[in-house]
């Protein structure tokens, strides 16, 4: 099992690494931050790496050996947490899944409605990759609640070559086919044409809404 330093959503090694990384931040926090301050302070990843590259006496009388033992213990604890979370079969430890890294967009009314209505309002879950330390930041939690939901790549030489991504759709009406029509593209890190000229727009027109004043 080889980890290629990519948090691919279809990767089991990526799932193991993220469990280790999360455990690492917890353990370094427990080691370095006084107990009375642990609700207020956390050690960031850059500082964590610096502490591991130049270990001090907090790791024990032999800091290098203590650091190595600390990392091995952290890995074992991370794997144990994954086993408890996803079961003993390592094939089930794939990173991108509903029980691990995913994107579920919860409607503001989601908690107040029936399960049937909630299924209409919420969008997802869709498997995701990455985390808060990767390009295309997808956040540090299991459910992606941070990161870009909209991106646009504008070609100022030819505006009709502009590309975009957005989520979850183009309508706020859950009964509309456009309510979540862009979500899968976004979750797959794919883009769509964002046409500019009238001819191009009308060539892919879904519907026209005409609003006429009553008087």
Model-assigned labels for residue ranges:
Residues 1-215:
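C-terminal/peripheral segments of proteins
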């Amino acid at each position: 099992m080889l980890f290629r330093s990519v948090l691919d959503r279809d990767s089991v090694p990526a799932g193991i690494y993220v469990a280790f990384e999360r455990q690492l931040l917890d353990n370094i926090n427990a080691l370095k931050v006084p107990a009375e301050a642990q609700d207020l302070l956390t050690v960031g990843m850059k500082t964590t790496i610096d502490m591991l590259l130049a270990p001090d006496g907090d790791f024990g009388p032999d800091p290098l050996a203590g650091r190595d033992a600390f990392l091995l213990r952290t890995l074992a604890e991370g794997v144990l947490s994954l086993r408890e979370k996803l079961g003993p079969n390592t094939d089930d430890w794939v990173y991108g899944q509903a029980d691990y890294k995913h994107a579920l967009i919860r409607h503001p009314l989601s908690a107040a409605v029936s399960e049937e209505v909630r299924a209409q309002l919420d969008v997802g879950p869709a498997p995701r990759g990455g985390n808060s330390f990767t390009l295309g930041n997808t956040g540090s939690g299991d459910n992606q609640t941070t990161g870009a939901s909209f991106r646009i790549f504008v070609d100022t030489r030819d505006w009709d070559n502009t590309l975009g991504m957005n989520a979850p759709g183009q309508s706020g009406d859950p009964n509309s086919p456009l309510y979540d029509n862009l979500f899968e593209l976004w979750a797959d890190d794919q883009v769509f044409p964002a046409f500019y000229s009238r001819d191009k727009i009308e060539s892919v027109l879904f519907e026209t809404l005409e609003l006429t004043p009553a008087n």
